[in-house]
C-alpha cells in the first residue's frame, strides 16, 4: 500500500510491552504515512501522556506489569484533567490490541463503553491491520 494522504498528521501512540509485535506495527503504520510513537513501558506512557498529541492510542490488552484497562483508565483521567486545565477538546480514541481470542460478548458486558471495533487482533495480516487502523482514525 502506498501512504494515504489522509494519514498525514494523524498521530498514533502504541503502548505495549510486546517489543517485537509493537515494533512491527510501528513499521507498518509509518510506511502507511502515520506519525508513530512507540512506548514499551506502560508506566513511561502514563508519565509522558498528553492527549493533545494523539488521534489514536493503541494499548496492549494484556501486559505483564499493567492491565490494558487499568492504563486506559489512567490515560482517560489524564485526558479529563488536561481538558479542564486548558479548555481543550481534543478528541482522541483509545483501543486495545490483543493476541488472545476475543470474546466480544464478555468484553461488552464488562466494558460497555467500547465497541467491537476497539479491539484489534494481533493475529491479523498487515492489510487487515492497516484497514482497521484507518477506520479507527477516520471514524
Describe the function of each predicted region.
Residues 1-11, 86-91, 125-139:
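Non-catalytic signal-transmission and effector/linker regions of two-component phosphorelay proteins
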Residues 16:
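Conserved acidic carboxylate
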Residues 22, 64:
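The feature encodes the CheY-like receiver
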Residues 23-31:
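Charged docking surfaces used in two-component/phosphorelay signaling
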Residues 38-56:
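Acidic, metal-coordinating helix/loop segments flanking the phosphotransfer/catalytic sites
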Residues 40-41, 67-75:
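Acidic catalytic/metal-coordinating carboxylates
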Residues 60:
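Active-site residues of response regulator receiver
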Residues 70, 90, 100-121, 126-131:
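Alpha4 helix (beta4-alpha4-beta5 surface) of REC/receiver domains from two-component response regulators
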Amino acid at each position: 500500500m502506498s501512504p494515504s494522504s489522509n494519514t498525514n498528521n494523524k498521530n498514533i501512540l502504541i503502548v505495549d510491552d510486546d517489543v517485537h509485535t509493537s515494533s512491527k506495527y510501528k513499521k507498518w503504520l509509518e510506511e502507511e504515512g502515520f506519525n508513530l510513537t512507540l512506548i514499551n513501558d506502560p508506566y513511561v506512557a502514563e508519565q509522558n501522556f498528553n492527549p493533545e498529541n494523539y488521534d489514536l492510542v493503541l494499548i496492549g490488552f494484556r501486559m505483564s506489569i499493567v492491565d490494558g484497562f487499568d492504563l486506559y483508565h489512567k490515560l482517560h483521567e489524564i485526558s479529563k484533567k488536561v481538558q479542564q486545565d486548558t479548555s481543550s477538546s481534543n478528541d482522541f480514541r483509545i483501543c486495545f490490541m490483543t493476541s488472545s481470542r476475543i470474546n466480544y460478548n464478555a468484553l461488552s458486558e464488562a466494558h460497555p463503553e467500547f465497541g467491537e471495533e476497539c479491539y484489534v487482533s494481533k493475529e491479523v495480516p498487515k492489510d487487515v491491520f492497516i484497514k482497521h487502523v484507518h477506520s479507527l482514525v477516520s471514524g
